[in-house]
């Protein structure tokens, strides 16, 4: 049973990371998305 919950947690973490990465890339490319808090946390300066 613990193995299943571990796999689910890994999947959730991967999904969250992918979503954050997509937002970060859009911010860097100057997309329509306003600079997210993640960009500020990573020390990326927005223009």
From Swiss-Prot:
Primary location class: membrane
Alphabetical UniProt keywords: Cell outer membrane, Lipoprotein, Membrane, Palmitate, Plasmid, Signal
Location(s), subcellular: Cell outer membrane
Coiled coil: none
Cellular component annotations (GO), alphabetically ordered: cell outer membrane
PROSITE patterns in alphabetical order: PROKAR_LIPOPROTEIN
Top-rank lineage group of the source organism: Bacteria
Transmembrane segments annotated in the record for this chain: none
Membrane topology category: Lipid-anchor
Gene Ontology BP term (one): cytolysis
Role of this protein: Lysis proteins are required for both colicin release and partial cell lysis.
Protein's name in the database: Lysis protein for colicin E7
């Amino acid at each position: 049973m613990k193995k299943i919950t571990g796999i689910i947690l890994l999947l959730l973490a991967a999904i969250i990371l992918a979503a954050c990465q997509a937002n970060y890339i859009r911010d860097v490319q100057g997309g329509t998305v306003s600079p997210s808090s993640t960009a500020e946390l990573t020390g990326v300066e927005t223009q």
